[in-house]
Amino acid sequence: AREFQADASVSLTAEGRIIAMEAAFRNAIGAYSIFPRSSVGDSVHAATQLGAPYQMKRLKTSASTFWQNKTPSGAIRGVGQPVPCTVTEQLMDRAARYLGEDPAAFRRRHYLQGASFPLTTHGGVYMDRLSLTECLDLLLDKMHYKELRKEQLALRKKGILRGIGIATFIEQTAVGPGLYGAAGVPATSIEETRIRLEADGSIRVETGATDQGQGTLTGIRQITAGILGCETEAVEVAASNSSGARGGGAWASRGLSLAGEATALAAEALRDNILYVASLLLQAEPA
């Protein structure tokens, strides 16, 4: 289990705009660091992802890791990312309360906007594209936010306290060599797919991805069939063969994101080869 402490603050302008966030994280990890990803990943994510969804001019964070005479903790469930989310969202709630502003509206006007993307946050996290405002508006509509607020006030007059919480969580997933290579972590994080057209017209796919019930292999079969224009029943997928295609495993929501992309690239290459050979046989231009 995680064992974090954080001292955090948010700075506002006289007009109620966030200009900075600051936090010092302390993370106890147990008796030793877990190989190969180590036990400091939680601390790194906490320090780099504080305030990630929001506009601000400055960010200051630090993270300290402590040894303990107890069972070590490692990379579990989001690897530290729930920690900066929890701290950030508490700061947002307190700032909104201080200003007397609705917490949802306060978040909306501080969100990173579509025109700002792609961007690198103050914590060094690259973001290609996010639709934060659209997601919030959809959420508020689905949960009937205005009606809930009215009901909340009515219940409060009767002495019944009901809380309404909103949080914006950005999770870094589908990680590969760009993260692990740069961090020097000795963990395989590539994904490889090999696709072959068999003599009987069937398609054989070798993937390094693993599937423990997520449906990854079904997705790979569908991607292959869609690009090659064949029935899914004609596609055979072979996985988890150490002498076959290489892969990094199923973690960090990366299975279909990376293996699926590798499959798409391989299927497109095979399709181009099929069309080229067919054009030679038929003496026609590839379609």
Residue ranges and their predicted role:
Residues 3-90, 170, 181-191:
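Glycine-rich loop/linker segments at domain edges
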Residues 38-49, 75-110, 134, 138, ...:
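Alpha-helical support elements that line or immediately flank enzyme active sites
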Residues 1-31, 138, 145-147, 260-287:
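Phosphate/diphosphate-binding loops
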Residues 28-32, 113-118, 172-177, 203, ...:
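Flexible loop/turn segments at secondary-structure boundaries
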Residues 1, 19-24, 103-112, 150-166, ...:
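Beta-strand segments within the central parallel beta-sheet cores of soluble alpha/beta enzyme folds
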Residues 67-72, 111-120, 200-203, 244-256:
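Short acidic (Asp/Glu) and glycine-rich catalytic loops that position anionic groups and cofactors
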Residues 27, 59-64, 109, 185-190, ...:
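Flexible glycine/proline-rich, aromatic-decorated loop/lid segments
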Residues 111-202:
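Helix-loop-helix junctions that connect adjacent transmembrane helices in secondary transporters/permeases
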